[in-house]
Amino acid sequence: MPETVVVDKLNLAGEVSVTWSGQVLRRSEHEVVLEAIFTHSSRDLGYVRMGPGDRFVEHYYTDRWYNVFAIYDAEDGLFKGWYCNITRPAEINDEPGGGLRVRAVDLALDYFRQPGGREFILDEEEFAALPLDAAEISAARAALAELRALAAAGQGPFAQ
């Protein structure tokens, strides 16, 4: 039976803004990959439409400043693209009663890549308004550059 996982998306103050659950697909020292099903109402973001039942394969890292979600359509299984959140490195912990808990502080800056390669860098104004120190700003910008390079090369979580 797959191991369950609960994901907490945190704001900069460390408060939970969204929580969801999924199933662990694999885990290593610095990464957990999970599958979660989108349970919210349909959302058309302009560059992707997400709907109830869409399957997300989510990659979280304890040593990287981002997470990556590969999104698949609920009805036909077609790949929609990768949604990437720039975050502080995730905390991945075993829960006392079993399963895992993943917690990541969202830094507002996001990256989306469509299957054809078109890129969208999102929420730059919101990111710029956060009270981050120079080291965090640098780490976040480096994370975005790393994501773009990995996506262009089809490596890491972008390998299909």
Describe the role of every protein-language-model region:
Residues 1-55:
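Charge-rich, low-complexity N-terminal segments
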Residues 14-19, 141, 150, 154:
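Long, hydrophobic N-terminal alpha-helical segment
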Residues 27-30, 74-76, 114-118:
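Short acidic-glycine loop/turn motifs at beta-strand connectors
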Residues 32-36, 78-85, 118-125:
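Short, well-ordered strand-loop elements centered on a beta-strand within folded domains, enriched
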Residues 43-49, 95, 130-134:
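A short, polar/proline- and glycine-enriched secondary-structure boundary/capping micro-motif
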Residues 49-95, 102, 108-109:
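Phosphate/ribose-recognition catalytic cores of enzymes acting on nucleotide-derived substrates
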Residues 103-148:
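A hydrophobic, small-residue-rich beta->alpha segment in the mid-to-C-terminal subdomain
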Residues 146-160:
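Cysteine/selenocysteine-centered motifs that mediate thiol-based redox chemistry or coordinate metal-sulfur cofactors
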